[in-house]
Design a protein with these regions (language model features):
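Extracellular N-terminal segment of 7TM GPCRs
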Residues: 1-47, 92, 396
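Intrinsically disordered regulatory tails of 7TM GPCRs
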Residues: 1-21, 179, 238-261, 323-396
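Loop architecture of class A 7-transmembrane GPCRs
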Residues: 9-24, 93-117, 150, 164-219, ...
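Extracellular TM2-ECL1-early TM3 structural module of rhodopsin-like
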Residues: 27-39, 66-129, 136-143
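Helix-to-loop junction signature of class
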Residues: 38, 42, 79-98, 115, ...
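Class A (rhodopsin-like) GPCR signature focused on the TM5-ICL3 interface and adjacent 7TM helical core
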Residues: 44-47, 125-137, 168-179, 213-246, ...
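Intracellular effector-coupling site of seven-transmembrane GPCRs
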Residues: 75, 153, 160, 185-203, ...
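Seventh transmembrane helix
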Residues: 224-225, 266-273, 278-282, 299-355
Length: 396
């Protein structure tokens, strides 16, 4: 790809050439591992997010609009991993140098757009989740706690992102690469490349699309994440100061603060993984020819890996930090199924239901404990009661 843009690297500098050479070497070495690593991450990620959706849709977990957004994030992540799993299977494990059928060429063209769109949707939904939590911390009766409002926001975000990704779909075209004849007839092979329209006038439309993608789908959500992270930290500090004054409300505020800390951890992880990608997207638009070929393509697999890792963030954070989530998770898994009741799992509301064997075992243990602590006087009274209750034939 040759575009009329400014130069970023001095190709006459030995240090620059050495760094670029190492990037190419890294790409060559990592490309041998990436397909297998990505395949495993996609398979495990699909299972993890399916379980995540199952847990968050339980009645005891549907009380929060944040959980509604988390379900939508999991669905988006599953779409990302499904598309990438199909891409890895066909274009890495079963690659064909001559080209592919028109169906697979069309899939590759759509995959280029879907991978960007679904990942951007996830990023904006994390921003929405942070906004909802911040609104709830300011006002406990915030309208953003309503599930319908949260779901409407998710739909609007998805529509906005897909509209922004239409130029990416148009930026690629399907080209015929091979034509041959077999005993079954004529066959055609196709590949996907950049559109000739996008490459005209010094890649004007291509650079415009890169700017559009870099700013609206990377830079802006990253900037919003930074703002909401700072706002959440500031709000937490204010709450801590209030708690020092109102000691009696500490227990009531503990759950809310705990939820905020979990969300803050998620936002921070997304920020550290997405901010470098946002910077690279801007540089890719500024220095398209050099940066795209020498840096972006050499690190493309690493960026894909970060995107796949982000698909695990919500499940891992909730699994390791939320006892309520873990208890609900154990209740829905077949091998660890235990029924729970009550609103709060922090106040000993664990119960066993509809399991006679468990009830009988508990009764036996309780009776054994009572028997073991009986005094001789208690045993004597029990024996007298048994004799008095012995069946006597009735007189007719």
């Amino acid at each position: 790809m040759e575009c009329n843009d400014s130069r970023l690297f001095d190709t006459n500098n030995n240090l620059t050439l050495f760094v670029i050479e190492q990037l190419y070497r890294f790409r060559y070495l990592y490309s041998n591992v990436h397909p297998f690593l990505s395949f495993v991450l996609c398979v495990l990620g699909l299972a993890a997010n399916a379980i995540h959706i199952l847990v968050l849709t339980r009645p005891r977990m549907r009380q929060s609009s944040v959980h509604t957004v988390l379900v939508c994030i999991a669905i988006s992540d599953m779409g990302t991993m499904t598309s990438y799993l199909m891409y890895i299977s066909r274009f890495e494990f079963l690659s064909d140098k001559e080209g592919y059928s028109y169906f697979w060429a069309l899939f590759l063209k759509c995959h280029a757009m879907l991978s960007i769109a679904l990942h951007a949707i996830t990023l904006y939904l994390v921003v929405l989740m942070a906004f909802i939590r911040l609104s709830a911390m300011k006002l406990t009766t915030s309208r953003w706690l309503d599930h319908t409002r949260a779901l409407t926001s998710v739909i609007l975000i998805a529509l906005f992102v897909f509209i922004m990704c239409v130029p990416t779909l148009l930026a690629h075209q399907i080209d015929e690469t091979t034509r041959g004849v077999t005993m079954h007839g004529i066959y055609y092979k196709y590949s996907v490349g950049f559109s000739t329209l996008m490459m005209k006038n010094g890649c004007f439309l291509m650079k415009a699309n890169l700017w559009l993608t870099g700013i609206f789908l990377k830079a802006i959500p990253c900037l919003l994440l930074v703002c909401f992270t700072i706002a959440l930290i500031h709000r937490l500090r204010e709450n801590n100061e209030k708690r020092k004054i109102l000691i009696k409300e500490e227990r009531a505020k503990k759950r809310g603060d705990f939820t905020t800390y979990m969300l803050l951890l998620m936002v921070t992880v997304f920020l550290f993984t997405e901010l470098p990608q946002g910077i690279m997207a801007i540089l890719n638009a500024l220095f398209t020819t050099q940066f795209h070929q020498m840096v972006y393509l050499n690190l493309a697999d690493v960026l894909d890996l970060l995107s796949l890792i982000n698909c695990y963030v919500a499940f891992l954070v909730y699994s390791f930090t939320s006892s309520r989530y873990r208890q609900t998770l154990f209740s829905v898994l077949p091998l660890t199924r235990v029924s729970y009741s009550g609103v709060s799992t922090r106040q000993g509301t664990l119960k066993c239901h509809a399991n006679p064997s468990v009830k009988q075992l508990v009764q036996r243990v309780n009776s054994a404990e009572v028997t073991s602590v009986r005094s001789p006087l208690m045993e004597k009274k029990a024996a007298q009661a048994t004799r008095s209750n012995t069946f006597q034939p009735a007189d007719f």
